[in-house]
Amino acid sequence: MGKEEISTTKYLIHAQINANGIVEKPDVVGAIFGQTEGLLSNDLDLREFQKTGRIGRIKVNITSRGGKSKGEIIIPSSLDRVETAILAASLETINRVGPCEAYIQVTKVEDVRAVKRKRVVERAKEIYASMMEEVTPESLKMIEEVKEAMRVHEITEYGEEKLPAGPNVETSDAILVVEGRSDVLNLLKYGIKNAIAVEGVSVPKTVADLTRKKTVTAFVDGDRGGELILKELLQVGEIDYVTRAPKGKEVEDLEKDEIMMALRNKVPVEQFYHDLGMKKEKKKTEDKMVLLRNILKELEGTGNAEILDDALNILREVKVENLYDELSRVNNHPYAVVFDGVITQRLVDLSFEKGLRYLVAVRSGDIVKKPHNLKLITGHT
């Protein structure tokens, strides 16, 4: 086939031919045109397709032995997928070639463009590899120094304790809590900008407060130190997910694929407790929920609302109609709101902004968007 055919061909029809007699290429080509003529509509006429260049020159490789012939037929096609399939199927209706009985079977229809794409990918790999070979160790060192400088430039200090953190910790709804500065730097290296470090086994107040406002994944080392930090986090903070570096490895040493695998394999904290056979500290949470329900019973029928801290002490007591405005003005870390009224989407959104963990009311309206770390409790649930 010519250069023009190669450039426009979309598919190659491959077929196997067997004939009970000695036949040659012109016989096969003649049979293809002769026996498919009139078989289909004029729109699918093989001769017309070849005249207009929509199929290329038919290639036939055939050999004869022992009074029988066997070979391969290849037909280039620039038709669409459906037309090519119909053309391929029509070949199998041919039952004679010249004076001989014959049988044709389509073995495959090859997508030429897919083959070209594969070649492009393979060649691109080769070119890239050769480019990398030309990069000198000095150049690699220089590149790494620039990358390291950029990572250090991106790292920030967060909270009163000036904890090492990525630039997105403040604005992101979800954060990663890691052990140290090196962990944050390594995550920045791979574009993860919402990590904050505890910088030791003791969990800082800033991190504990963040766990009440955001969806938090604890990402710790796969060693004893990681276990200790995780236990402290689970006691002091409100962790949503847990993941660990592979056993014996530290987060600061992980490659990109190891980090992504660990984050994909994170588990809800409830499952973490269950999988490790650890005792989950449910009692404290369950006791709080009982107390919150009791407070709701006391408030029913009063038209009042109470804004509470994490010890369930009253920060502010207001009328329900003033609740939204009063909650907007509260800045000393409200933990829960209990009120004699109906939970609305507007109030849910504000509660999430304020970092509340519980919103308790007589009943709930139609809530379309419920934050993961805000629990809604009503008198009917």
UniProtKB/Swiss-Prot annotation:
UniProt: Mg(2+) 1 binding residues: 179, 221
One GO cellular component term: DNA-directed RNA polymerase complex
Family matches, as CDD domains: TOPRIM_primases
Its EC number(s): 2.7.7.101
Annotated PROSITE patterns: TOPRIM
Chain coiled-coil ranges: none
Record-linked Pfam families: Toprim_4 (PF13662)
Entry's cofactor comment: Binds two Mg(2+) per subunit.
UniProt keyword list: DNA replication, DNA-directed RNA polymerase, Exosome, Magnesium, Metal-binding, Nucleotidyltransferase, Primosome, Transcription, Transferase
InterPro entries: DnaG_primase, Primase_DnaG_arc, TOPRIM_DnaG/twinkle, TOPRIM_dom
GO biological process, one term: DNA replication, synthesis of primer
Domain annotation Toprim: ranges: 173-259
Binding-site list for Mg(2+) 2: 221, 223
Top EC class for this record: transferase
Reactions mediated catalytically: ssDNA + n NTP = ssDNA/pppN(pN)n-1 hybrid + (n-1) diphosphate
Keyword Magnesium among record annotations: yes
Segments crossing the lipid bilayer: none
Protein task: RNA polymerase that catalyzes the synthesis of short RNA molecules used as primers for DNA polymerase during DNA replication. Also part of the exosome, which is a complex involved in RNA degradation. Acts as a poly(A)-binding protein that enhances the interaction between heteromeric, adenine-rich transcripts and the exosome.
Family classification: Belongs to the archaeal DnaG primase family.
Assembly description: Forms a ternary complex with MCM helicase and DNA. Component of the archaeal exosome complex.
Protein name listed in UniProt: DNA primase DnaG
Gene label: dnaG
